[in-house]
Amino acid sequence: MIAAELDLAKPFIFELPGLLSTDECERWIARIKKLGTDLATINTRTGAQVESLIRNNRRVIIDDSDSAFDLFKRVKDHVPHEIHGGKLVGVNERLRCYEYEPGQRFAPHSDGAFVRNEHEQSWYTFMVYLNDAFEGGETVFFVEPEIVIKPKIGMALFFQHPIIHESSEIKSGVKYALRTDLMYRAYQL
C-alpha cells in the first residue's frame, strides 16, 4: 500500500464553507434522528468498545454510496488529488453521523484509516458540520500553534488522520456532524 508520513510542521487542515445548504443539513439531521443513535465506540486492539471517559457522544453509521458520490462531486476540485503514491478515487461510503449533547465530547485522539483493500485506503478525514446552534463543540487540533475550528452549518473540514484533535465538550444545545474519509488508490498495482 501507500507509505504515509505526516509533517506536523505543516499539517493539512482545510475548511470548505457552504458545502451543504441549511436545508440539506436539516434533512441529514432528520435522517439521523429517524434512524436513532447509539453510544459511539472507539477502536482498540481488542476491537470496538464503549470508553465513555474518552468518547461519550452518540452516532449512527450509514452505508450510502449515492450520498458519498454526491459529496465527492462537491469536493473533488478542492482536495488533494495525490498523496504518497496514491490518487484520489472517492469518498468512503461509510458515513458516520455524530450527535453530541451537553456534557459530551471526544477527547484528544487521532483518526484511523479506512482500508478497503491492499491498494485503497483513506488518508484524510472529511467532516461536515450539520448545525451550529450550540455552545462548545469546537474541533481543536493540537499542533503548533493550536488550531481551533468553530463549526458552521454546512461547512466541511478536511485533515490528515494522524493529527491529534478533539471535539470539545458541548455546553448547551446539540451538535450534529457527518464524518467520512477521502479515499486514495495506489498507482502501482
Over which residues does each language-model region extend?
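Fe(II)/2-oxoglutarate oxygenase catalytic core
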Residues: 1-156, 162-189
